[in-house]
């Protein structure tokens, strides 16, 4: 007899891949702050990923993982990507190395691309979720959604649960995907070579079996992170718009046996007639090979998956590698995929149900964007949802998720459309070969796409949380509003510790007001600094208005000062308290100066800030610059936060200047 149950939750995340886990990790911080917040994450698989899948982590993703406390653990296991080798056919049709270029543009970030298989990345995120949420958030397996109802009339009611989900608990048998007869672990069961009906069949109860418990869940919000064949997206009726090529690629994770000289270096290889290969060196001597296959998709996109075996992929790889030898000593995983670029028309319904990751955009894996873009989707959504659920922000900010991430997804599709066709095309034999791809054009696209692929080039348009119109961009030329606030080295004033300023901007739901105090030893400049500090301590400042009386002054908006003096020329106590220098706290004032073991970083110059007059920069909880103004720009700061934050019932109120000469003992 089927059991039925009923429950309530604030957020239900469907899918425990990279997008779903990132959503859970960001939201776990708000669960820590508000333990009665109920966040659930479900997945139809009985276990997480152990082999294969995505593997590349780009610069911006690593920066975000650092702010979540995850980057160091992942980097300790990952394989570094530093140089890409380009191979093209010579006059005899044999591949030869024609160039080497940096994998990541030098200076673009303190990180550059690394690779580690998805299973290990997910493991680190899962451990972090358990730690931060005190095990309140766990992946529940195997569950599958079967029905979703949305009461749009209740969408704007903050206390309502307008989304009703019906979930079914699956048996272990039905939650273990078929491997299509291959002995090697593979992902053909969820690659885009199969139809939606075929994927659904993998997870249906066997004939004659009874379904498990049915649970009705009343949700405030739902996030669909359930992949390219997203059930959530289809239930919402959102269409994927775009096109597919007839190119088919195979993928191998293997320990190779080869005399190819760059087998442990990232490579882009174009052969004369046999197709192309991309090489991605992995951890533990594994190498990933993206191998273009000779087979093409039939009209309508139908593909016979039984034709794609490891042997077929290896055989084609041997042709492309000629005259070098190539074989596989150990095969860890394989799959095949059909190149296509599609993006859904909408990313949310009533700002109550959202979709993210592959559920709303699909593309080729060549530029290492799939996992990265998916994680950054929910990194963007998570802080906005967290602030709304904890009563700190207005629901209007949720509209900016679709505004920001749909625009980026479309840019990604356009980039991948060009890049994947250049990669899959046959090299031009000469300048008169109009059907072939110019290798010079390919290299140019590769280099130009480097910054885009790194994730550091995102520039969000004007919206509620990104105030370009009011900003005085000339005051911080390189802190471009809408782009991520780039980390630079600084010295912590209290003890002279050299550090990256980005490490101070942990992802915990706080906005930052970064006070570039400039030359604070100058009397005129210090007068400006004191006036700004007096504003922050006043009854009507954004700190006083939006901070609850029972909370620390920096718990909602974190004020951090960076001055351009040498720390020997000014003392911490010279800065006005408590706004800029909270009593007995020492991580609020930093200097752009040299230290015993590091030269002067010239970070003011890197940020494009005048070393005398300074500036004020507001940074969102996800690390993106949202407002640039000066020390007199309090009206702009007031206006920015008034459109986003909600005043608590009991406010912090005005603060009086601390007297450092008196003991509190």
From Swiss-Prot:
Task: Output the Gene Ontology terms for molecular function.
Answer: FAD binding; phenol 2-monooxygenase activity
Substitution effect: residue 282 to M? Leads to a significant slower initial step of the oxidative half-reaction
Record key words, sorted: Aromatic hydrocarbons catabolism, FAD, Flavoprotein, Monooxygenase, NADP, Oxidoreductase
Q: Which cofactor does it need?
A: FAD
* Oxidoreductase is among the record's keywords: yes
Activity as a function of temperature is given as: Optimum temperature is 30 degrees Celsius.
Top-tier EC class: oxidoreductase
InterPro entries registered for this protein in UniProt: FAD-bd (IPR002938), FAD/NAD-bd_sf (IPR036188), Phe_hydrox_C_dim_dom (IPR012941), PHOX_C_sf (IPR038220), RIFMO-like (IPR050641), Thioredoxin-like_sf (IPR036249)
Which residues are noted in the entry as FAD-binding? 18-19, 43-45, 51-56, 118, 290, 358, 368-372
Reaction equation(s) it catalyzes: phenol + NADPH + O2 + H(+) = catechol + NADP(+) + H2O
Q: Residues that bind substrate, according to the entry?
A: 55, 290
Record text on activity regulation: Inhibited by excess phenol. Heavy metals such AsCuSO(4), AgNO(3), or HgCl(2) severely inhibit activity.
The pathway this protein participates in, as annotated, is: Aromatic compound metabolism; phenol degradation
Instruction: Name the EC number(s).
Output: 1.14.13.7
- One Pfam family, short name please? Phe_hydrox_dim
GO BP term (any one): phenol-containing compound catabolic process
Q: How does activity depend on pH?
A: Optimum pH is 7.2-7.6.
The UniProt entry's sequence similarity note says: Belongs to the PheA/TfdB FAD monooxygenase family.
Quaternary structure? Answer: Homodimer.
PANTHER family, from UniProt? 2-MONOOXYGENASE, PUTATIVE (AFU_ORTHOLOGUE AFUA_1G13660)-RELATED (PTHR43004:SF20), TRK SYSTEM POTASSIUM UPTAKE PROTEIN (PTHR43004)
The job of this chain, per UniProt, is described as: Hydroxylates phenol to catechol. Phenol is the best substrate, but the enzyme also accepts isomeric diphenols, hydroxyl-, amino-, halogen- or methyl-substituted phenols and, to a lesser degree, cresols.
Q: What is this protein called?
A: Phenol hydroxylase
Question: What species is this protein from?
Answer: Cutaneotrichosporon cutaneum
């Amino acid at each position: 007899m089927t059991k039925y149950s009923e429950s309530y939750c604030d957020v239900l995340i469907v899918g425990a891949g990279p997008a779903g886990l990132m959503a859970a990790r960001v939201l776990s911080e708000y669960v820590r702050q508000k333990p009665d917040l109920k966040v659930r994450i479900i997945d139809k698989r009985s276990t997480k990923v152990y082999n294969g899948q995505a593997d590349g982590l780009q610069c911006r993703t690593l920066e975000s993982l650092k702010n979540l406390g995850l980057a160091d653990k992942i980097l300790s296991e990952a394989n570094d990507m530093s140089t890409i080798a380009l191979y093209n056919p010579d006059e005899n049709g044999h591949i030869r190395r024609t160039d080497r270029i940096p994998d990541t543009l030098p200076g673009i970030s303190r990180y550059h691309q690394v690779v580690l298989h998805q299973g290990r990345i997910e493991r680190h995120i899962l451990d972090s979720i358990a730690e931060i949420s005190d095990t309140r958030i766990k992946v529940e397996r195997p569950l599958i959604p079967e029905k979703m109802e949305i009461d749009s009339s209740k969408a704007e009611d903050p206390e309502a649960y307008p989304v009703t989900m019906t979930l079914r608990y699956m048996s272990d048998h039905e939650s273990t995907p078929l491997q299509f007869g291959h002995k090697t672990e593979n992902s053909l069961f969820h690659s885009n070579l199969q139809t939606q009906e075929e994927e659904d069949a993998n997870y249906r109860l066997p004939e004659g079996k009874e379904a498990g418990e049915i649970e009705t869940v009343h949700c405030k919000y739902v996030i669909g992170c359930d992949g390219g064949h997203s059930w959530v997206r289809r239930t919402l009726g959102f269409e994927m718009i775009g096109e597919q090529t007839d190119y088919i690629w195979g993928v191998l994770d293997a320990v190779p046996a080869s005399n190819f000289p760059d087998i442990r270096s990232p490579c882009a290889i174009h052969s004369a007639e046999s197709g192309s290969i991309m090489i991605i060196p992995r951890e533990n001597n594994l190498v990933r090979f993206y191998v273009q296959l000779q087979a093409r998709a039939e009209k309508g996109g139908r593909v016979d998956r039984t034709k794609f075996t490891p042997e077929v992929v290896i055989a084609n790889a041997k042709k492309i590698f000629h005259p070098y030898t190539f074989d596989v000593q150990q095969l860890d995983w394989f799959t095949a995929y059909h190149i296509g670029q599609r993006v859904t028309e909408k990313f949310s319904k009533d700002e109550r149900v959202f979709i993210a990751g592959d559920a709303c955009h699909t593309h080729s894996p060549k530029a290492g964007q799939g996992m990265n873009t998916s994680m950054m989707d929910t990194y963007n959504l998570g802080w906005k949802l967290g602030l709304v659920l904890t009563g700190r922000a207005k629901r209007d900010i949720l509209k900016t998720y679709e505004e920001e991430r749909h625009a980026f997804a479309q840019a990604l599709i356009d980039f991948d459309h060009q890049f994947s066709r250049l990669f899959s095309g046959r090299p031009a034999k000469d300048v008169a070969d109009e059907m072939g791809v110019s290798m010079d054009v390919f290299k140019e696209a590769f280099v130009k796409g480097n910054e885009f692929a790194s994730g550091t080039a995102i520039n969000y348009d004007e919206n509620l949380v990104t105030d370009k119109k009011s900003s005085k961009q000339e005051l911080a030329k390189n802190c471009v509003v809408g782009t991520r606030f780039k980390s630079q080295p600084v010295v912590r004033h209290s003890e002279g510790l050299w550090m990256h300023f980005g490490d101070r901007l942990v992802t915990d739901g706080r906005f930052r007001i970064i006070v570039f105090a400039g030359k604070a030893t100058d009397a005129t400049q210090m007068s400006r600094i004191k006036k700004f500090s007096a504003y922050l301590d006043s009854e009507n400042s954004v700190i006083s208005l939006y901070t609850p009386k029972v909370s620390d002054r920096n718990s909602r908006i974190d004020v951090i000062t960076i001055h351009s003096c040498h720390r020997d020329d000014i003392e911490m106590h010279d800065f006005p308290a408590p706004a800029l220098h909270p009593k007995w706290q020492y991580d609020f004032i930093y200097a752009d100066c040299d230290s015993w073991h590091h030269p002067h970083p010239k970070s003011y110059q890197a940020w494009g800030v005048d070393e005398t007059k300074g500036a004020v920069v507001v940074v969102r909880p996800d690390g993106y610059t949202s407002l640039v103004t000066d020390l007199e720009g309090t009206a702009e700061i007031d206006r920015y936060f008034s459109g986003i934050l909600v005043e608590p019932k009991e406010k912090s109120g005005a603060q009086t200047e601390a007297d450092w000469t008196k003991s509190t003992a």
